[in-house]
């Protein structure tokens, strides 16, 4: 039961007089919405206030949700409210003051337990060892868990919805084929797939373009399943899956290099070394495609506290200009840049719906905390793309042959279906000097 709730409830109501949401407490008391119908936030335990008190902002609210001490009847609506409704009254200091008042009113005397799904890495960032630990935290939840929401190809990166009403499977096939087209893959070539995941690009490239592929990942379970999928398709003679850091690859050069959804894990301190390694790994005249998430605004934080602790430890989506400058300083020539922000928002919408459709199995495989982490993350990430906080880019480059600049045409757009037959939802970006 609430011990001395009334003064606090009056203070909360006064601090938030215009509320597009309701708050319901664990004893049934409710602070109703005052500005139309909206989501209801359910405070299931005083620990919710303690989490916010100890870590005001995104991390405290995330911990409260993951632990189950805070819930919301409409998660999408709740995130939209938090994104759009940011009154000056609820700046961080006010959050702390209200949380402290709640702790006193409800007799909170101990720090709450931090959810087990949280990770806080130690040591210097972006060493080989720490990067391996970060990847294990994200991917080793289980292959079966990811299969609940990914498409049948197990492609864990942005799909491309060029036709408007295609399935997730079709959109992922379009993306994989687009990567092959941009790399200009030819039969008999040797290709490197950095961050190969469960092998979707390697399998597609080998099956449809007759190339051989070396794919690398830092996740042992991921590599095991990728090898199994390769063997099932009779491609073991053309695809090699390794557990290896990109910095340790020493058997280049390759005819083409694809890095899909990996650059956001590299970090600002390592981006130049990463770009130099790409140059070392591709033959003169060969192509490189760098596909990854980036920030849209210079000066935005690299990754939120919740994402750092629960999803992508040490994740650092950089601004496009920072990535492109590193690639060009290393010696690559940029030919084409394309933005797929709307497509990633749609991809995340599909993933979130599929996870919800398999919620009981997700809880069985990953546990309730981990499942809540992913339900929150998939929706929060989608909001980031929809509101313009983040985007995803494909940067197509080549390594010049000696001092001569490589000749590679820059198309108006290389999206599937961009021949006028269907509207395009993302636009090719002109190549700008990177400085």
Language-model regions, residue ranges each:
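Feature captures hydrophobic
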Residues: 1-166, 170-172, 178
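Substrate-binding/catalytic lobe of Class I Rossmann-like enzymes that use SAM or dcSAM, i.e.
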Residues: 293-405, 412, 416
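Conserved beta-strand signature within the Rossmann-like core of class I S-adenosyl-L-methionine
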Residues: 285-293
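Conserved class I S-adenosyl-L-methionine
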Residues: 187-195
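Conserved SAM-binding loop
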Residues: 226-227
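Conserved SAM-binding loop of SAM-dependent methyltransferases across substrates and taxa
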Residues: 198-209
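A short acidic, Gly/Pro-enriched loop at the edge of an enzyme's catalytic core
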Residues: 247-257
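A short glycine-rich, Lys/Arg-flanked "PGG" loop and its adjoining helix->strand segment in the class I
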Residues: 272-285
């Amino acid at each position: 039961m609430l011990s001395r709730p009334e003064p606090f409830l009056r203070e909360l109501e006064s601090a938030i007089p215009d509320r597009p949401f309701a708050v319901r407490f664990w004893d049934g008391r409710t602070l109703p919405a005052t500005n139309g119908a909206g989501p209801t936030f359910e405070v299931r335990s005083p620990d919710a206030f303690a989490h916010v008190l100890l870590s005001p902002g995104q991390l405290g609210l995330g911990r409260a949700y993951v632990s189950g001490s805070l819930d919301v009847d409409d998660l999408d609506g709740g995130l939209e409210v938090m994104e759009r409704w940011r009154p000056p009254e609820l700046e961080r200091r006010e959050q702390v003051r209200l949380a402290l008042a709640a702790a006193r009113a409800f007799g909170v005397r101990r720090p709450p337990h931090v959810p087990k799904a949280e990770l806080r890495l130690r040591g210097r960032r972006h060493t080989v060892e720490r990067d391996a630990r970060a990847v294990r935290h994200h991917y080793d939840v289980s292959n079966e868990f990811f299969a609940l929401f990914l498409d049948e190809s197990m492609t864990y990166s942005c799909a491309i919805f060029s036709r408007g009403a295609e399935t997730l499977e079709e959109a992922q096939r379009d993306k994989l084929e687009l990567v092959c087209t941009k790399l200009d893959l030819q039969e008999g070539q040797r290709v490197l797939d950095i961050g190969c995941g469960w092998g979707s690009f390697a399998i597609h490239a080998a099956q449809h373009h007759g190339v051989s592929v070396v794919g690398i990942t830092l996740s042992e379970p991921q590599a095991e399943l990728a090898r199994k999928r390769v063997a099932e398709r009779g491609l073991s003679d053309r695809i090699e899956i390794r557990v290896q850091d990109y910095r340790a690859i020493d058997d280049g050069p390759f005819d083409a290099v694809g890095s899909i959804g990996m650059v956001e894990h590299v970090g600002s301190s390592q981006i130049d070394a990463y770009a130099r390694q790409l140059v070392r790994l591709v033959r003169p005249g060969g192509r490189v495609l760098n596909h990854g998430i980036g920030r849209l605004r210079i000066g935005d934080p690299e990754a939120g506290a919740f994402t750092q602790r629960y999803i992508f430890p040490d994740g650092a989506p950089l601004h496009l200009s920072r990535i492109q400058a590193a690639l060009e300083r290393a010696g690559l020539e940029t030919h084409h840049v394309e933005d797929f922000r709307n497509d990633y928002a749609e991809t995340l919408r599909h993933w979130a719906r599929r996870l919800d459709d398999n919620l009981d199995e997700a809880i069985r495989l990953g546990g309730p905390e981990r499942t809540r982490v992913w339900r929150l993350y998939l929706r929060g990430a989608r909001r980031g793309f929809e509101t313009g906080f983040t985007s995803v880019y494909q940067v197509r480059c080549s390594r010049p042959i000696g001092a001569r600049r490589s000749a590679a045409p820059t198309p108006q757009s290389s999206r599937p279906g961009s021949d006028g037959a269907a509207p395009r939802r993302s636009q090719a970006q002109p190549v700008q000097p990177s400085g």
